[in-house]
Amino acid sequence: MDSAWVQQLPPELQNDIKAVVEKDQSSFAAFDNLHAFLTGGTTKKRKLNAEPEEIPPETIIFEINEISFYSPVRKRMNLTLHLVEEDGNPSPALSIVNPSNNIPELTFTGLDQAVKLCLLLPILGNTTNTQKKAICYLCFWMHDENMSKDPIVCQMNLDLVKKSMIKNGKLPADIESKFITPRDALPLNPIQERIIDYFKRQFQLCGISMMNYMPCVSIFRNTFSLNDDNAIAMNTDGASQPALVMVNCHKGAKEGVLILLQANKTNPAHIIFGFKKPILVFEASQVLHTSYSNITRQTFSLNVVVLNKKQEQRELEFGMIDEKFYKVIDDFIKLQGINDATFNQEESGDDSIEIVHVNNNDDDDDEEDDDFQSEDSGSDVEEEYNSDLNEPLAAHEEDGVFERGIEIE
């Protein structure tokens, strides 16, 4: 056990490895393989704080300039797809880049393996407003929690992206004259659709499958089956059932959005709670059963019991949901084949299964286990500022804040 990497470990870890290897000499091969994977694997996150270098312009594949990030950093940055050298070969990378010096603050490589979920999402309240309908969220969740526990979440205005693309020569200057769109049209206009299609194709070339849930009636055939200030149901690719449901709700005292995603060719069905900390993300297959409670004439609660990676059952309550949206939520649950335990609980009066109840009080952000992790101090702020310019972001970009992303496995 004379490998150089072992000698670089703290004495306590060296002793632990030595004790295991003394019992089974063959076990060192597993340690050695683990070290090789962690130091040379394809799923990497690089914090460039030693000698950060500017991204050479000729290596940039695609860039979205100066958009508002809420996670894992909180300021205006560039989102850049570019090429880096790995093992002597060019490989696509995704970086969050400081626009003042074009130096990445965070870089992911091996994108086909690194990115688990990439979503373009509408924002509740904006879809019914013709002035804000083009403002959306772009989100990335990573496979390896050791590499990134925070999702990449940014908010962008497709109209501002259009102006930037015209300025950079990605779109013709006279593109506005090629299309006529009524001012009060709620679906996106043809130019915005083409921008999204361009995003999707560029990400796909780099190994990222972006799922678009914005209303695009021509290219993507995405249409609203429900469009309310407090709820959205989106049918994609001309399907008869919604692929996306978003509903305002509360988890304890915290207001947020419950997001239900149907399975597609790329991803399994997911349930997400955002956008304030902590963000919950889990696959629908992890749900053991659901039930409804606190039912009144106007609102109800959805209780979801999931199995985490410790094989513990966790009960999550999403409350204060408008009764108007019961059917669209219940239809999603039935399509997933999830058992509705509402009547079983009423008849039994108590649970025969031991369930870990998640604290729904205001201090539930302080929970520290595999599913809920505490935030860094100072991250929960009311207004985001550009750290370089010390200016508040535009008012239309302050609709909601994404915080730490927690996945239940």
Curated annotation (Swiss-Prot):
Extract one GO cellular component term from the record.
chromosome
The record's principal subcellular location, in a coarse class, is nucleus
Q: Which Pfam families match?
A: PH_18, Rttp106-like_middle
* Any one GO molecular function term: histone binding
Output the superkingdom of the source species.
Answer: Eukaryota
- Cellular compartment(s): Nucleus; Chromosome
Work out whether the entry's keyword set contains Transcription regulation.
Answer: yes
Which keywords has UniProt assigned to this entry? Chaperone, Chromosome, DNA-binding, Nucleus, Transcription, Transcription regulation
> According to the UniProt entry, which residue ranges have a biased composition of type Basic and acidic residues?
394-409
Family of the protein in this entry: Belongs to the RTT106 family.
- Note the subunit structure: Interacts with histones H3 and H4.
* Chain's role: Histones H3 and H4 chaperone involved in the nucleosome formation and heterochromatin silencing. Required for the deposition of H3K56ac-carrying H3-H4 complex onto newly-replicated DNA. Plays a role in the transcriptional regulation of the cell-cycle dependent histone genes by creating a repressive structure at the core histone gene promoter.
What name is this protein filed under? Histone chaperone RTT106
